[in-house]
A protein has these predicted regions:
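Hydrophobic alpha-helical membrane-insertion segments, chiefly the h-region
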Residues: 20-30
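Short beta-strand edge/turn micro-motifs at domain boundaries
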Residues: 13-14, 29-34, 125-129, 141-173
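N-terminal Sec-pathway targeting helices
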Residues: 2-20
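Surface-exposed, charged secondary-structure patches
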Residues: 94-140
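Ser/Thr/Pro/Gly-rich low-complexity linker/stalk segments immediately outside membranes or between
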Residues: 30-47
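Hydrophobic pocket/interface hotspot
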Residues: 70-71, 78, 95, 128, ...
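Short, solvent-exposed secondary-structure junction/capping segments
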Residues: 49, 68-86
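N-terminal alpha-helical signal peptides/signal-anchor transmembrane segments
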Residues: 45-56
């Protein structure tokens, strides 16, 4: 006659092994998978979009942190290709001046980056493709929503991924 308790005892082992495998999978995801170069570049682009956003009640301290975050996302020098408004090579000083003008003209802005695709060229270089959306209001009361396809080149400098160039293309919407 078979012992029914042996079946339950074996079931506890199987359950414990499955639980340990699930815990190992979760640990792997948080420890390794979220730190891949592709994930780090995607997070950097999302952080840049967040820093470019602005609300009407934003404090000076928050604004300074965002300006620092924006400037820190780019290599020095970097190249920008956005219509006739912002085109050419930017060193750190020129980039900070442009960020200051942007923030002074805008009273409210919601900037998002979506459909981020990273193509690793080698361990230190990557191309990033995404859609950028600006929905905002200028201080003169004009408002607009702009959607662009963006191609960026990223370079890894001192272990951090920085944007070396950005090219904007118009999108029909």
């Amino acid at each position: 006659m078979k012992n029914p308790h042996k079946k339950i005892y074996l079931g506890k082992y199987i359950f414990t092994v499955l639980l340990l495998l699930a815990a190992a999978g979760v640990w792997y995801w948080y420890a390794v998978a979220g730190k891949s170069d592709e994930a780090l570049i995607g997070k950097a682009i999302a952080a840049l979009a967040s820093d470019l956003s602005k609300n009407k009640q934003e404090s000076t301290a928050t604004a300074l942190l965002k300006v620092k975050g924006i400037a820190g996302a780019f290599a020095d020098p970097m190249t920008l290709g956005m219509d006739q408004y912002a085109f050419g090579s930017y060193d750190r000083e020129r980039l900070l001046a442009s960020i200051g003008r942007y923030r002074a003209m805008v009273s409210r802005a919601e900037v998002t980056a979506s459909d981020i695709t990273v193509e690793m060229l080698d361990k230190e270089h990557a191309k990033v493709y995404f859609s950028g959306r600006f929905a905002g209001e200028l201080k003169n009361g004009m408002s607009d929503t702009i959607v662009k396809d963006i191609e960026a080149e990223s370079v890894k400098i001192d272990g951090k991924w920085l944007i070396k160039s950005m090219k904007f293309r118009s999108v029909l919407h």
